[in-house]
């Protein structure tokens, strides 16, 4: 073998799939699987079998193409170690940096409000239905839970970071186990309700409207955008110097594709298992009760007549506990991002970016008071969680995940090679449909 052949062979071996690629595949997958997944079966199953089958077809393209677009934006910066804020500033100046900071903050903060409502409702339904205690005052419950989480965050942040990272995989395993365990309870109710003669494409309960609203919850549930910037920086530092940027882009796309496949497989199996165990009418009731699907499953098994199996009794309690842990995990992770974003905004606009004018402790205190105070107000008001996701959470995520990369591809010279592609049209349409949910909710 010649020297040149040896070099090519060595480079091919080094550039093949690495352990770090597997680690990042699982990391992206684990980031997306959180409390938001607990609401996807409700929205997906609300319209019955045909809409959820259409969502199954759309799930992977939405997850893959949208996150790949964001990764390409992150890859387009001249500095391999530059994050998304630096890249946007490079393309669009300081104004672009301010816009991305606002987008990141407002993409995460509404999620905290959603989780504040969710954890309050989940705890209250567990307290009343599984433990059998008298109802508590909602304002007191929300305040107690938020103060408890604030205490843990304030005094044990480093420990909680480790604990939450360890909880990702047990939570995913729990979802898969519950999905499998529900199989003996599957029934044909969702199939029996399919009447092809009475199906409507349009109208409030039509297939198109149901799938349109389902796109929002998919954007929300299949979302690992907060970690994409760190992921791209890591891969650029690992591959770009030796193999070039085009190779790094293909490697990032490959990792995102595999993570998306895993994510869609787990979430859609969980959604179908819930739908075949319950029914579209049950999903509508869960939406009206404003609780995640695991809490509804717990209540469903609690209300079963006759002799209950050991599994049914176990699931009745385990489902609510798993839901509470999942929501706390998601709340904590999003709190850290919101805190960092709000600290940056306060520093930028309140102190003109001068870090010497205010201590980190004071910044954290001011931000915590605003975050926890606003979350308590929303949790006490108890807006419908799915409506909140569709009207606030998902549209802001779509702005960051879909429309910002498409705008950059249109305007930035370093992204010109991606112009004119069909997948760009798909990502743009998904982003616009998600944002238009705001208009639909107003009328």
UniProtKB/Swiss-Prot annotation:
The keyword Coiled coil does not apply. It is found in: Cell inner membrane. The chain crosses the membrane at residues 22-42, 44-64, 97-117, 140-160, 163-183, 207-227, 261-281, 311-331, 366-386, 389-409, 423-443. One of its GO terms (molecular function) is symporter activity. Its main location: membrane. It catalyses: L-threonine(in) + H(+)(in) = L-threonine(out) + H(+)(out); L-serine(in) + H(+)(in) = L-serine(out) + H(+)(out). One of its GO terms (cellular component) is plasma membrane. Disulfide bonds: none annotated. It comes from the Bacteria. Belongs to the amino acid/polyamine transporter 2 family. SdaC/TdcC subfamily. Involved in the import of threonine and serine into the cell, with the concomitant import of a proton (symport system). This is Threonine/serine transporter TdcC. It comes from Shigella flexneri. The gene is tdcC.
